[in-house]
């Protein structure tokens, strides 16, 4: 019953009837699944606490205390609200770890495939939502409220499918074609959303995966020099390709056909024509430089209006490069957590991530590294799938250890 409630929640996660940040229908089903999982575990007297998640519990205590202190000082309700977000994430992590099994993962992968096909049907039916730029450009966002939100959902679904694919002991032609077909579908949908953050994630994923394959083949080949020459040629061709897409000094994205490539060129142009303050300002991260003391002990998560840049800050910016004013959270999961809670809680959370990832299948690390690389561009760590991918890495690592132990004993 709990597994089915979980699957329904995953399917409903793509439907946003209320503004982002509100409680959605999927959250209600996730909560119901969590309650049913807890009841089932308590009734069967199975494990209710996992030692692997002790660092998470420590981080949660820090987060509750820090947000509590700032709530007492400011009476701003955003602080307890963000604490509840973290408690919710902990509950979902516990539930996912408890439900994790071969049958559960098979069902989850099927729901992920259904989600991707559904968004494709929404695209071709013409009923999807679009984000309209001020000058007329459009980005597809399916049934979501934001194109980056849509792209992140598709991206994490792709990673879940990859993690499930790598759990298989035997790879048939049907399995390979089925998986990579869905992966290409996901890449196509991300292209429609024109998300540069997800592009970075996919780029890291393929670079790590290709690097692993190249290293393995090179080490076991009798023609190592040939492999090294081939690798060098590939890097040169890649560099030439990057050089060819570099935008000119007068680049204007509004004068292009507005594709993912033109958005990448736009980002490159901004980096080339701006400075460090421009880059930070675009991510709402100027506070990292203006008030670095919070990196030590934390600013709490909420009441972001406190960090409106001081008068005269605009003089540090390059005119005409960035024109968006932010007063919200930092657009980077890692730096937002670090700034909000300080160096010790952030280090504890990083330790938990490393523990879950370090012993998993090498290829699966490509998926986790891609997720972490993408998380530096957007604040996505409140999304359930962000943590599910990391927990999957940890659970597959445990399975690997068990298999190795059984092999040795056998």
Would you name each region that the model predicts?
Residues 34, 157, 206-209, 367-376, ...:
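Transmembrane alpha-helices of multi-pass inner-membrane enzymes
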């Amino acid at each position: 019953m709990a597994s089915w409630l979980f699957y329904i929640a995953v399917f409903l996660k793509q439907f946003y009837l209320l503004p982002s940040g509100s409680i959605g229908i999927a959250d209600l089903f996730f909560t119901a699944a969590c309650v049913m999982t807890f009841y089932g575990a308590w009734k069967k007297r199975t494990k209710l606490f996992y030692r692997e998640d002790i660092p998470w519990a420590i981080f949660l205590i820090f987060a509750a205390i820090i947000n509590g202190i700032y709530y007492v000082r400011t009476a701003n309700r955003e602080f307890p609200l963000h604490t509840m977000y973290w408690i919710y994430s902990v509950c979902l992590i516990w539930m996912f770890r408890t439900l994790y099994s071969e049958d559960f993962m098979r069902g989850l992968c099927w729901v992920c495939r259904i989600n991707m096909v559904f968004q494709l049907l929404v695209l071709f039916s013409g009923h999807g939502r679009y984000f309209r730029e001020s000058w007329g450009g459009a980005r597809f966002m399916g049934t979501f409220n934001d194109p980056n939100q849509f792209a992140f959902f598709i991206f994490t679904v792709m990673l879940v499918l990859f993690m499930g694919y790598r759990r298989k002991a035997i790879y048939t032609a049907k399995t390979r074609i089925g998986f990579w077909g869905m992966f290409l579908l996901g890449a196509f949908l991300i292209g429609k959303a024109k998300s540069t953050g997800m592009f970075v994630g996919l780029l890291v994923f393929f670079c790590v995966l290709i690097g692993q394959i190249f290293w393995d083949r090179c080490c076991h080949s009798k023609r190592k020099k040939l492999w090294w020459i081939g690798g060098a040629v590939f890097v040169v061709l890649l560099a030439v390709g990057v050089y060819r897409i570099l935008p000119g000094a007068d680049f204007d994205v509004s004068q292009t056909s507005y594709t993912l490539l033109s958005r990448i060129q736009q980002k490159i142009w901004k980096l080339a024509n701006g400075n460090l303050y421009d880059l930070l300002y675009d991510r709402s991260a100027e506070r990292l430089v203006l008030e670095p003391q919070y990196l030590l002990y934390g600013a709490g998560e909420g009441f972001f209006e406190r960090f409106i840049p001081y008068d005269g800050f605009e003089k540090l910016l390059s005119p005409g490069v960035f024109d968006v004013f932010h007063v919200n959270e930092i657009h980077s999961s890692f730096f937002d957590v670090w700034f909000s809670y300080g160096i010790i809680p952030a280090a504890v959370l990083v330790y938990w991530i490393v523990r879950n990832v370090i012993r998993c299948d090498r290829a699966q690390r490509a998926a986790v590294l891609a997720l972490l690389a993408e998380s530096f561009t957007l604040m996505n760590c409140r999304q359930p799938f962000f943590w599910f991918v990391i927990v999957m890495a940890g659970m597959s690592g445990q399975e690997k250890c068990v298999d190795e132990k059984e092999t040795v004993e056998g």
